[in-house]
């Protein structure tokens, strides 16, 4: 049974990260639609699809618990704005030739989490964690020196997702209900935008009779299915294994950027990636070594 659960965990985890890693292929199908319009539609269809999913959610007490702690709605509203900002930056990057920067941002994210833990949660870093953060900082500094500006796409993606995770710690709601409630709280903003500011393709009635409309509607399941797979995988896999699997998504994005969409990995970018990869190797080794030192059950 344990082996079967582990195998199931690997399949589910790989499914989640492969879907996340292939997001650029999906968003390229919507390339003519502005990023903000895609995100508004994504919020709407995720809210609707999420409502259907929650009808089958096995933990029905989540809504009662949320209503008994109304301050969590405020936290989820803030985290919803952060994840929407993350989504919009990512979609813009994919459809404007900045997939390499997007990939770099998600490579940096675990190290940003370490820094946020140190600065805001007063967590103490181990020596190898300090080394990993220093190497990542050198990678970012190298980009600033070469380009003359901050790699803002990478930093916005890493910081919004890092703060998103940090804020969600303040609202202990299961991942799926939490994300669905976030999209529900985004709905008023989305509807205002659709009613008063929408002037792109999806605002035209004729659009909804085209095949492209199906891809827009698919934003709901495309957003939520990998999250469901990830949550299920987390119940069957060691945390360290999930930590290693998370690098699959940015690696797939990196490969698509170079092999499919013609983005150039020049020596400057390669140097930055090398610093980040080395930092992640140090970080992963430190995490693995720390887990080995924990007392084993039984």
UniProtKB/Swiss-Prot annotation:
**InterPro entries in the cross-refs:** EamA_dom, RarD
Question: Keyword DNA-binding, does the record have it?
Answer: no
One GO cellular component this record assigns the protein to is:
plasma membrane
Q: Which SUPFAM superfamilies match?
A: Multidrug resistance efflux transporter EmrE
Its membrane topology is listed as: Multi-pass membrane protein
List the keywords (alphabetical). Cell membrane, Membrane, Transmembrane, Transmembrane helix, Transport
Q: Which residues cross the membrane?
A: 9-28, 38-60, 72-94, 104-121, 128-145, 150-167, 174-196, 211-233, 240-262, 272-291
Q: Where does the UniProt annotation locate this protein? A: Cell membrane
Signal peptide residues on this chain, from the entry's feature table? none
Coiled-coil region(s): none
Q: Where is the EamA domain?
A: 18-141
Membrane found in the keyword field: yes
Classify the main location.
Answer: membrane
Lineage: superkingdom: Bacteria
> What family does the Swiss-Prot or TrEMBL record give for this protein?
Belongs to the EamA transporter family.
Question: Which PANTHER family does this UniProt record tie to the protein?
Answer: ACYL-MALONYL CONDENSING ENZYME-RELATED (PTHR22911), SOLUTE CARRIER FAMILY 35 MEMBER G2-RELATED (PTHR22911:SF137)
Mind telling me which NCBIfam families this protein's record contains? rarD (TIGR00688)
What is the protein's name according to its record?
Uncharacterized transporter PA0485
